[in-house]
């Protein structure tokens, strides 16, 4: 992914969803992240990364299971969660860094 480093280095917190098209739990994340996106508006960004088409990025961040969410703020990893967390947990984590 060409602009990945630029995006995660911005001042706007960026929640990255590392997923795979064949992953059942990953499919459950999409509607959840759509709700989170509506709730956070422009205060945070949500980015989806397919680990099968972006293997270098997945390897760089040690993604071993999907879905994995990583929240970046100014290039630093500030929160990480594997599996399907609750919307409340995601919102709480994002709101801590906006």
Model-derived segments and spans:
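Short pre-active-site segment immediately N-terminal to redox-active cysteine/selenocysteine motifs
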Residues: 11-12, 19-22, 65
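Typically the conserved alpha-helix immediately C-terminal to a functionally engaged Cys/Sec
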Residues: 27-40
């Amino acid at each position: 992914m060409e602009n990945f480093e630029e995006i995660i280095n911005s001042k706007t917190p960026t929640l990255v969803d590392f997923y795979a098209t064949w992953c059942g739990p990953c499919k459950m994340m999409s509607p959840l992240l759509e709700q989170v996106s509506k709730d956070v508006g422009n205060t945070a960004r949500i980015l989806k990364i397919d680990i099968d088409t972006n293997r270098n990025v997945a390897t760089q961040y040690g993604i071993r299971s999907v879905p994995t969410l990583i929240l970046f703020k100014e290039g630093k990893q500030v929160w990480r969660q594997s599996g399907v967390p609750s919307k409340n947990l995601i919102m709480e984590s994002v709101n801590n860094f906006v």
